[in-house]
Regions:
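N-terminal, positively charged/glycine-rich alpha-helical extensions of SAM-dependent methyltransferases
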Residues: 2-32
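Conserved SAM-binding loop
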Residues: 57-61, 66-181, 208-211, 249-251
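Acceptor-substrate binding/catalytic loop of class I
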Residues: 193-210
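Short, flexible, mixed-charge acidic loops at enzyme active sites
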Residues: 180-190
Length: 282
């Protein structure tokens, strides 16, 4: 069942948990080692899909001219490499100490100072009507984030709000299967200690089918879903046909279209009809 009750994306317990880890983000052999190595998959996944949509902008800086929002950026592990590809990246996180860690680390790289910024703010605060984030971004990235959220429905609506029409949403997360429980929680947290105990809650995991259904009912079209596999012996990630544990998803916000009912453009039945038409007949 999709979580939708709190109307906020932030779970206070998750904030407390990550507050304790805020100074550990850039230890490549520490609690976030698997996220560091995940960049080998997720950075090309984001880059290549954006290039397919927008084309190359500049040699060496292929994402130049694109605005990307990194939701739940933590210490900036993914924000920085996207910035090095030329994108104008805003990393946001509700944990202020994590933002502080990200800012300090980015400050040491002169190449990032002009196009990587951070804010200690929630997604819903950024996306509020009339806010600075509304309709401003070419892409939203939420990598290893949705399994920590309080409300997926609110998250989806907020992502739609901040994206430009035709903008991309990139998600990596964990499937809700018995295998994911055994490997992502029992093995990773309790046996191998790859991540701290208590990092994940299986009840918050979401299957690709559920996530796709939620996105496509809220103004997105899912373009692709790919399975990801972590090898704890080598500390590396690889693509796999199976999505039973980890997976990456790319969705696109539907382009704005003329209203079907010119007399009442605010009629919710018209909005629903438009969404269905786009989904089933495009």
């Amino acid at each position: 069942m999709i979580r939708s009750a709190s109307k906020t994306t932030v779970d206070p317990n998750e904030v407390k948990r990550f507050q304790l880890l805020a100074n550990k983000w850039w230890n490549e052999q520490g609690d976030f080692a698997a996220l560091h190595s995940m960049n080998d998959l997720r950075v090309p996944f984001i880059r290549d899909n954006l290039l397919n949509a927008h084309g190359g902008r500049r040699p060496g800086k292929p994402l130049a001219g694109l605005r990307i929002l990194d939701v739940g950026c933590g210490g900036g592990l993914l924000t920085e490499p996207l910035g090095r590809l030329g994108a104008d990246v805003l990393g946001i996180d509700p944990v202020a100490d994590s933002i502080g860690t990200a800012e300090v680390h980015a400050w040491h790289d002169p190449d990032l100072r002009g196009n990587v910024r951070y804010r200690a703010i929630t997604l819903e605060e950024l996306s509020e009507k009339g806010g600075q984030g509304a309709g401003q971004f070419d892409a939203v990235v939420a990598s290893e984030v949705v399994e920590h959220l309080a409300d997926l429905e609110t998250f989806t609506l907020c992502c739609n709000q901040v994206l430009k029409p035709g903008g991309s949403l990139f998600i990596t997360t964990i499937n809700k299967t018995q295998l994911s429980y055994a490997l992502a929680i029992v093995a990773a947290e309790e046996v191998l200690r790859i991540v701290p105990s208590g990092t994940h809650d299986w009840d918050k995991f979401v299957s690709p089918m559920e996530l796709e259904r939620l996105l496509e009912s809220n103004g997105f079209h899912v373009e692709s879903i790919r399975g990801m596999l972590y090898n704890p012996l080598s500390g590396s990630w690889s693509w796999t046909e199976s999505t039973s544990i980890n997976y990456a998803l790319h969705a696109v916000k539907l382009e704005e279209e003329p209203n079907l009912d010119e007399d009442d453009p605010e009629d919710p039945t018209v909005i629903v009809a438009q969404a269905k038409a786009r989904r089933w007949y495009n």
